[in-house]
């Protein structure tokens, strides 16, 4: 097999593998879309916010690059900007490193509720992040 064919196979495998482990969550209204990267065991990251995306756009959003902006920044590791949450644990440590436990979506009347459960990797500290979107106005 030529080097070019091997590179194509490797690139295709990496794309497939990357999309298998990523879990995007889309919170949409009739006019807008918010896309979050929410892999279980990973960090909640902001992917896109803007005009409503089509199904094709949503399927291809992973091709736009790797999300690197935390959707819920916490005080401690890797948060040079403003934090959404800071705590002081019983031992005095203020570091948080939140990972996703689960993502649930439910519908209630004319709204869709997305609940993302986060937990600290070291301490028994949990946070639920909720997104509410109106389906029909």
What does each model-found stretch correspond to?
Residues 38, 131-133:
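Short, low-complexity Ser/Thr-rich regulatory SLiMs
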Residues 21, 30, 123-125:
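Residues that act as N-cap/strand-start positions at coil-to-secondary-structure junctions
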Residues 11-19:
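Bacterial N-terminal signal peptides
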Residues 1-11:
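Bacterial N-terminal signal peptides that target proteins for export
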Residues 121-131:
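Low-complexity, acidic Ser/Thr/Pro/Gly-rich terminal tails and inter-domain linkers that flank the onset
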Residues 135-137:
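Conserved small/polar residues in nucleotide/adenosyl-binding loops
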